[in-house]
Amino acid sequence: MTNSAPHESLKRARPPHRSTAARERVIARHDMTRPRPATSRDRSLPPMRRAGARRLIAILSGLVLAAFALAGAPPAAAQDWWTKLPGFEPFGGKKTLSPEERRAQNERARDALAQRVAPEFQAEQPLLSHATIRALEAAIGRYQAIAAAGGWQPVPDKVTLRLNDSDGNVSIVRRHLLMTGDLPAEAGTTWGFDNALESAVARYQLRHGLRITGFVDRRTRLALNVPAEERLAQLRQNLGRITALMKLAEAGRVVMVNVPAFRLEALDRGSLVLRSNVVVGRPDRETPEVSARIIEVNFYPYWRVPDSIARRDLIPQIRKDPGYFARERFAVMRTWGAEPLDPSYVNWNSPAVSDYKFRQDPGAFNALGVVRINMPNKHTVYLHDTPLKELFDQSARAFSSGCVRVERVIDLASWLLQAEDGWPRDKIESVLRLKLSETVKLKKAVPVHFIYVTAWASGTGAAHFRQDIYGRDGLEGVAGNDLDDDAPQLSSVTP
């Protein structure tokens, strides 16, 4: 049987009993980690002496925590007291951050990195343009040479690499990015992950539609490991697609949605007017390739739930969570145009419920948001706003049931209505501010095309690649819908 009583030597070593406040006063007098005014001598310590100072602080920190242990305080309480000291800094000299502070710090760092590399790839020409075709042909030549030379070496599974790392895997990434032109030739193929490589990784991530982090995370590693031969095949296949689609961009005003790129472009006589991020359908509910005509814009629309979504999603959700119906402001009717039923009298487990019709009231909570852009087509898909703005922060945005959610939907509506009498931008903003339900029919319908292009090249010559989210390229290495690691788990009751 284990004896849990304190060892006799520890009993003898235990200091006289003091109150908690007294103990803290004693320790505070000898606390070397408390902030003190910086002096020129502090700032001028050479590296060797700074390292010695850090070791001394580590020793003293251990002694402080040991004093708590000898006084009978549990380790968790000692650590809690220690980290709450004014100006507390861990041994490395950096302030301890809360999870929220660390996320915000990482987000700021990512934004700064993105702003540093994004201007290199900003192109004014739209996807469907002769400039894109010329750049794509040049990119095919470069990737032919890379493939002929044997391509690149894959990064081992589960490897992540970031600034200041140093091993052979860093050299693999450097050689890859030298081949693709993301890393300048003078950067070399050393084993060190330096600032030049961080910027090169960010460029690579931008070209592949990945979240810009500057380090080799899981999704970046997967993209790096697509063989050069498959990237070449992807470029060739999409050159054919873009060439065949060129005639669609020749209309006066036209809206193009490139589904796997999660991007919308509005064109006027071939010139780019507006570009926006979009959310598209999940792989099990694909956004179709479709051509239609935009005929009207709805402000504060109702959402008439399609029968398929009602049966697959809404009714099961109500059975699981009876409060969902009222909370999300739905109405239920036996047929369209009939009076709404009292949901408390509906037998939600009855098979007859599958034939009922459902409608969601207008409002910012509505699944369509505050704007719907109607484009009649056999697939009953359309463009609309969304209350889930945070989805646009994701780099992979296949979350819908097939319809397309537009980040800059107000700008798009304003552009569509600019030729309509009485609908300037301030009128639109007034309608939205007053929460008025309005439908504006366009005098001249605007063509809209949902297309599927997974590779192209920009005017700067950079080749861009996207995942084949619906498996339409027939290339194993680029197929899949790999979401960001922090992708949200969403309710499936959505258009």
What do the PLM-derived regions correspond to, one by one?
Residues M1-A53:
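N-terminal secretory signal peptides that target proteins for export/translocation
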Residues T2-N3, P75, T494-P495:
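Short, intrinsically disordered, low-complexity terminal/loop segments
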Residues T39-S40, R49-R50, L60, L70-A71, ...:
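Intrinsically disordered, low-complexity segments enriched in small/polar residues
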Residues R54-R55, R405:
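Basic side chains
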Residues R55-A66:
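Sec-dependent N-terminal signal peptides
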Residues A66-P75:
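C-terminal segment of classical bacterial N-terminal signal peptides
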Residues Q79-P184, T189-R211, R218-P495:
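Well-ordered beta-sheet/strand-loop patches within structured domains
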